[in-house]
Structures are given as C-alpha cells and as structure tokens.
Amino acid sequence: MQRYNNNLNKKNKNEKNDGFTCFLREIMVILQTDTVLFLFCKKNEGRTVRTDKNYNNRNMKKIWVMMLATLMVSSTMMAGNVKKSTTLPIEGEIVKASHPMIQYVGRVSFAKNPDVASFNYPGTTIEASFQGSSLKMLCRPKTGYFMAQIDGCEPFKVGFNAERDSVVTLAAALPKGVHHAKVMYVIEGLFRKPEFRGFVLDKGCQLVEAPALPERKIEFIGNSITCGYGVESINMSDPFEDETENHWLTYANIVSDSLKAQHTSISRSGIGVYRNYNGPKTGDADNMPWQYEYTLFDQHDEKWDFAKYQPQLVCINLGTNDLSTKNYDIQLYEKNYRMFIKTVRSKYPHAKIVMLTGPMLGEKESSKQRTVLDRICADANKTDKNIYRFDFSFQKGDLGYGASWHPSMLQHRKMAAELLPFLRKLMNWN
C-alpha cells in the first residue's frame, strides 16, 4: 500500500490538480502494478477504505478494459473541469460577407452586423469569382445545408451542423487561376438562424469581378413543395428533416436554370394564403400575405425593400395548405388570394404573374381551387392582362413520393417539364 500512496502523491509542480487529473493518475498507477485496487468510499465517514486482491495476468486484460471504460465515463462526467480544445487559426485571406464582389440573390439582411449576411428562405444564392486553387466558406455553426458548384461542374452538398462547425472546404487543388463559386441555401432556416460570414482564399489571392448575373428574374412564392420538402427521401412515411429537403432539386430551380434566369424563393412549409396547414377555419394571422412584407421569415424587425429585386415573372403556388384539411372556408381563401394578388402587383407593377395549382391536393379540393383561381384571373384580366393561370398534373405515385407524400425528385422534374414550355412562350425566353 505504501508504494501506491507514494506514487499517487508524486506530482509535477506545473500539473493542474483537478478531479480528472487525479483520476487519470490513479489509473496509471494501477496499470503499473501487479495488484488491482478496488476503492470503496463510505458516504458517511468521508474516508477511503482500500482492499487488495491479486489477479493473474490472464485476467488483467479484462480488468484493463473495464478500467478504460470507467475512464471514458469519468472523463464525460468531469467535462466541466477540462478546458475545451482550441482549433487552429484559419490560414489564408479572409473575405467578409460584405465584400462588394460577392453577389447575392434572395432576401439577405445585414441589419444586425454589416459584415454578416443573414437569411432563412431556401434558394438564397451566393456567388463569387476568386483567384487561387482553393476556397473555404465561413458560416455560423448549425447554419444548415448548401449546394455548391465550382466552375459550373457537378454540384455537391455541404453542411454546417455541429456546435463548432463554422468552416467548410468548397474546393481544393484547383488549377491556379480564376474560378467561380455558386452556393445555394437549400433548406428552411427559420430555427437555425443561418449566417454567411465570408470566404477564405489562398494566401495572396483575392476576389475578382464575377460575371454579371442573368438579366432574367423570377420570383417563386410557395409552400413546402417550392421549398423542396422531402425531395431527397424515397419513403412517403418519412417525417420532415433538413437532411432530405433540397431546393436545388425543385421545379423552381430546374425551371430557372433552364431559362437561364436568377430566381428568389419566398416559400415556407405549411404556409397558406389565408390559412396555414390545419389552421383554424377563420384563418391564421401569420400567413404568407403577412410574412411577405419582411426580409426574413418570422422576423419582423426589417421590412423588405422590393426595389432591390424586380422580377419580370412571378409564380405563386399557394393553396395546398389552405385546403388540405377539411376545416377550411373557400370564400375566405378566395378573398385573401384576391388581396394578395393586388399586393404582389403593387410591388411588381410590370411583372407577369402566374397563379399555379400544385400536384398534391385531392380531386375535390383541387377542383375548388382551380375554379377560384380561374375566376380571380378572369376578373383581374378586365384591367390587368398580365395575370395568368397554370395547373400542374396530379401526382399518381408512379414517380414515387418524397417525405410525407410530397413530390419526389422525379415528380419535380416532371413539374418543371410541364411548366417550362408555358413560361418560355409566355415570356418569349428561348
């Protein structure tokens, strides 16, 4: 016993005497002896009683495994006494999100910090051209998922999900020269509070002027279908998850890309034009017409400046949530939709506006919706000839379903294939 006590009391004068260090020292001493010491602490006497028992070498391996497991548990319990690790400093040229050569498409706010871009609508896009052979992206930890594309090549998904996950490599080992990066936020960031903080370039490199964004501009106003809810899932019974939502794969992005147009997506799962999903029959106050006025969804301290983005085309896909459960009032739906059309027209006086019906509603509710929108369009056309109608075909399951019966990736491609010819002709965008 004397050898145990002497070894236990030998401490480096620079060593920190916290609980975890003492525990580790005890384990190391035990492993160096031929004796395993079982420690029993009597709660009421405040002292330690030690009893010895010799074990042969064959049993020692089992004991070591048990002690190692104990060490792991103890280290977790004593985590408060252990200093957190420090990451290596970021090497390279840091370019802030406020850099004038970074291009944004979508509703982005710099109100809280002039060097940090805040956003939470899917489809928000960041583009830049840069010198060098690598590119890193800086975001607030847990910002969520992006699709990234370098020099127009195959897009790939990146994520910021851990507590300290703030730097992600987008490109490495590129040929030296000038390259272009496009990054799109592909989920709904309402609860994540996403922030883009900048890029990291190779030492001595900088951003250069990027190619001009397309002159063609579209705005999609919609619900979970336009967001891309569950599009990466292949099981209709799957719940909502950020991991399976992806706006890049939606009809909205496919159509915009095919038309060589930039687009914004003002969309949110569960939103309605008068009543959100399964809301009261009288309607919800926080519906799309109310949220539409603000830069960020459900954050109402900053009104959006509609002069920043004036689309030539607006596509509205709302009504699935209003009518998807039986507790709805079709007259209130029509009344609010008429008012919302007037709001959109006031923001975009020269845009063509297309009212869409989606593929998810049942036949009865879909028929009611189409009748209402046809009537709104006909009435509007008496004074405004730039209001139009379009119906997607119903999803039948032959192309599969995404999560919660939402359109699958193949269904979104079909939707894009249906909508594209109509919009090409309407806009004369060949």
Model features per residue range: what roles?
Residues 4-5, 26-30, 42, 47-50, ...:
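Short, positively charged and aromatic/hydrophobic N-terminal segments
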Residues 30, 35, 40, 49, ...:
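N-terminal secretory targeting modules
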Residues 123, 190-191, 231, 237-335, ...:
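Conserved SGNH/GDSL esterase-like catalytic core that processes O-acyl groups on lipids
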Residues 226, 260, 264, 319, ...:
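Sec-exported extracytoplasmic/periplasmic mature domains
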